[in-house]
Every structure is written in C-alpha cells, then in structure tokens.
Regions:
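Mid-domain Rossmann-like dinucleotide-binding core that forms the NAD(H)/NADP(H) cofactor-binding site
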Residues: 4-82
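A generic alpha-to-beta junction signature in SAM-dependent methyltransferases
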Residues: 24-25, 93, 105, 117
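Local beta-strand N-terminus motif with an aromatic residue
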Residues: 28, 74, 97-98, 140, ...
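NAD(P)H cofactor-binding loop motif with strongest signal on the N-terminal glycine-rich segment
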Residues: 35-36, 105, 128
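Glycine-rich phosphate-binding loop and adjacent beta-alpha segment
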Residues: 60, 108-175, 209-213
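Short amphipathic alpha-helix with an adjacent loop that forms part of the alpha/beta core around
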Residues: 84-95
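C-terminal capping/lid region of NAD(P)-dependent oxidoreductase domains
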Residues: 95, 172-182, 190-213
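N-terminal Rossmann-like NAD(P) cofactor-binding module of classical short-chain dehydrogenase/reductase
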Residues: 99-102, 124
C-alpha cells in the first residue's frame, strides 16, 4: 500500500469494516450503504461484498457519486434526491427489505430506515447531522428493528484487533479501491482545505509531502 492509499485508510476503513463485521457480519445478507460514495461508504460497499453480502445497495446524491458507488461494486445505486428511496429499495429487495443499513446520517434517515429494514433488521449508525433527534419508536419496536451505534475511537481491543486482522488480509490481497479525488502539495494547502470544507470533491484529498533526505 503506498502512502496516498494509506492516508485514506485510518478512521474511514476501520469504521466501515466494524459496521460490516459487528454482530456476526453480513454473509448472505442484503445491505444498504447510505452515502455510498463517502469515505466510509465507499469502503463499506467493497468490504460487505468481500465478506459475503448477497446484495449491496448504495444511496448517493448525484450521478457522479453513483458512478463511484458502482465502481466500488454496488449491485444497485439509488439517487435519493431524484428517486423515491424507500420505494426503490422495496423494489430491489422484492418487498422484503434490507437486512442491514450502514448509516452515515441517522437523524435525517431514521424514518426511511424504519421502512426499508426487514422485520428484525439492523441499522448500524456511525454518524448524524442532527442531535438531539427524534426516532420513530413504534415502527421500530413493532417490527423488532435494531439500532446499533459505535464510534471507532472507542472500540474494544478485541473489535479493533479483529478489524485490523481482516483489513490486513484485504490489503494483502489488493482487493480494495482507495478513492483519491485529488493530490495536492503543501503549497496548495489553503485551497485544499477550502475544497474539503465546501464539499467540492467526491473522494479524498491527499496532501503529498516531500520526503526529507
């Protein structure tokens, strides 16, 4: 793994991998990855497929991001700003719903998630743009839906070791794409920060620092 790819891994890759691995993993499951072109989502698509998911659906906001999700291997992509997400997921799963949702923004998507999960399904949330938030309690409890939360900084030693071991094997086999949208130098650091802050890039911006001799 080169330095640029290594810079992309860190928190996003471990977050994606734990979201896929937790509670027994996703073998033979249908998984919806919210934000499938994001730093975490792009890895989560690939990792879910590598670890046995039967079908991976991604939700994204733009056609350009849809292409990124497809390049990561998503079996289907829904553009949630122009398509009815709940209806499309129902169609893609023949009305059954998904087994697991890997969720980047629970506060925004909680109501839709309760409709898209199968009975007994699980939403694994690692982020929310809204806090505090309202949850659809009765739709959740009436269908035995599960909400799981985690932040990668507070993983147990066992969970962290498991994720590191699986990630090492994936990297050794060269099966992961690393979504690098732009490479910049320290001379362009102001512009680089502005682009990240303004969300102009679909992917990671990597700063290349010359090696000192």
């Amino acid at each position: 793994v080169d330095d640029a790819a290594g810079a992309c891994l860190g928190i996003p890759a471990l977050t994606a991998l734990h979201a896929v691995l937790m509670d027994g993993g996703v073998t033979d499951q249908t998984v919806l990855v919210a934000g499938g072109a994001g730093a975490v989502g792009h890895y989560a698509i690939q990792m879910a497929l590598q670890l046995g998911a039967r079908q991976v659906i991604a939700s994204v906001s733009t056609p350009a991001k849809a292409e990124l999700a497809r390049s990561a291997g998503a079996d289907a992509v829904v553009l949630y700003k122009s398509e009815p997400l709940v209806q499309r997921v129902a169609e893609l799963t023949q009305g059954r719903g998904v087994d697991r949702i890997i969720e980047v923004d629970l506060g925004v998507n909680a109501d839709a998630n309760a409709q898209m999960l199968r009975a007994g399904g699980q939403c694994v949330a690692y982020g929310s743009s809204i806090s505090p938030m309202q949850l659809p309690f009765f739709p959740l409890i009436s269908r035995n839906l599960q909400l799981k939360f985690f932040i990668v900084y507070n993983l147990s030693q066992a969970d962290r070791a498991q994720a590191h071991s699986v990630l090492d094997r994936m990297l050794g086999r060269g099966v992961l794409q690393h979504n690098i949208a732009q490479r910049s130098t320290l001379d362009d650091i102001v512009s680089a920060h502005e682009q990240v802050e303004q969300g102009r890039l679909s992917g990671n911006l990597v700063l290349q620092i010359p090696h000192q001799t």
